[in-house]
């Protein structure tokens, strides 16, 4: 594989994209200079010495180096130019930068695809990709190299539209849409999902929330007609096969998972079989195989064009997903080679298709579906010939693909399935029946659903084919049931399926580079010829390249000892103690969203934390406690620390968190928790020497033992508190029970990584005054989590003066409470404290460098997700 010219060309093309994205244009040009220098050196090199035979071999190697470097350099330059043209795209929404990232406008355009989606809160909405032709009254012009301007439009219920309900819109429909256009959200926590980058991989730069949608012209395109037939067929399938089977077939045939039950979808993901629910090369291969069996004539040009047309039509239905495009183009290339009696090479064909895709949109290199698709086919191409010498059974292909995908799926999805190698065989076998049945049923529905012009023919067709469709629907129902049962039986959490932390990028890169080295034909030849020095040199080169890749792609949070996690309007602090121990202080939370499972759990797993040693909860309001409770239910927390006033709520807390009473630790002022032992809590009120010896610890400053506990507990409602970040209703119309809950927030002084952090929950100014009077200089801290998200009612001059933080962090998201208050920000700026905000900068991480500044302050190292 390595000797293929297209391998070197693809390597150069992808390298230019990666270097430009991670290091910038200057670094990309620097690498180009190195390539030119290497090529020039080899070009100027004289003839190597040696006997005739040795001389010929050395001449050949020198020629290969020169030509290989030239190929690498040419494709690298082409890719750099392509990336530059991509970045020169004119932005018709450039005014967004001047309006804080949001503007209201009217756009006219053509629908490219649409579907019904479900938000994290469980509400359905209509999502469309729209090709914009006009913005306001001004047309959108394009230069020859520019991409079409695409908007991702979201329309929620109860908005003024031409649609009586949420119904998918046919591609090709002309719409006039008024709404708010926004810059999509980027990655807000280290190593987590980057929504903005994902949209770029599918050619979308902006998101619009529709306020009004009006249809200008109905769709008359082929794609629109196919879309309508697809929706009608799936609606018909619900009647013959049932809603569950129809939802599964929507995923299997068209890659749309919106109607699959969440538990079923999660089982497929855990079991390593989720690829069956995303239209991929497997589906295209099955379709191609069926067409080949049905075609009885000579497989010449007529067969070539028939297959090409069918694949184009199916690609329309699958919205041209990267895996479908990859498989379809490779099949067309294979057929073309057969018709022209040319040699077909799987690896070279893969490289050709990848180059075509990246030439259109270089950002597609970061598309998960494309990465998995090409990893699978390239692993098959490189490794299957080697393993076929030892084993040729039914598990060969599945095992080889898992060899290529296992580390990647662990990195991206944080799952490892031991059953994937075996269960994929029967799953693919059943898919071999479901895909032809589904497509056959769709083809028959085209005949029945589209009326004819001949009188009586529709009735005849209905009588002839309706029973067939009924039988096919029942068969689909049975096969779908068998498919889900097989998958469910083998998906046993903790036995066949395991949650894992994401492996480091350097390890991931090293694995694939060494896999390529040892399984490629060229690498095996070096080993067989016992060229130990060459093999050792290549291994060192692979490891060095992997280390460089890991360093280049590092987020900067790897060395942070305290991270203020972005959970929106809520508090969450990640404390990294020595010996690899990890703690959270609060965990955010939203009433209608499982933030613990969908935000905190991915954050922890992707940053190397399989399970927290402990979690501290300041108080039981939703925006502090709910995320932690949800994380506990996922089995991610060993110990839970709360205020002792909550002791009589032990049963309720255990029910909400799924933890046992033995795992709850109740705290009060004067106690210290050692971060070396999460189960240890000791009163150190009169033992300052003991506390000083605990270098990494949590000191509980508030509330005092039994403070107002009886009053507070009498007033608390059952379940989660509902403060949600409001400053006790900003002191208006809020019941006193919410104020009492805030007043009894656990106030913690945390010492970790050479830094001190004062976590203040949602206390108000009166509480801060009491703390200032009691502790005075004992409040001195490096980092301050500003109380109550920066509410104007949570400012005390004395408290701030004694705390004297080097950095004040406001944990806020989008809100209607006016957080953070401008005067509070100015007050901390006046005290020369650095200001950091989750809503503007995403996650914020702090570490401490050796030595103090000239002013006696610690040297803080600060890293943020957003600039």
Regions found by a protein language model. Give the residues of each.
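Hydrophobic alpha-helical transmembrane segments in multi-pass membrane proteins
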Residues: 8, 208, 262-423, 437, ...
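Active-site HxH/HxHxD metal-binding segment of metal-dependent hydrolases
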Residues: 622-658, 805
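Metallo-beta-lactamase
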Residues: 612-623, 784-788
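Cap/insert and terminal regions of metallo-dependent hydrolase folds
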Residues: 639, 768-843
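Core dinuclear metal-dependent hydrolase active-site scaffold
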Residues: 362-365, 487-614, 658-780, 840-867
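Transmembrane helix-bundle segments that form internal channels/tunnels in multi-pass membrane proteins
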Residues: 1-93, 104, 294-298, 379-563, ...
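Aromatic-rich juxtamembrane segments at the membrane interface
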Residues: 201-329, 335-336, 563, 756-761, ...
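Membrane-interface helix/helix-cap signal primarily in integral membrane proteins
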Residues: 81-275, 525, 598, 602, ...
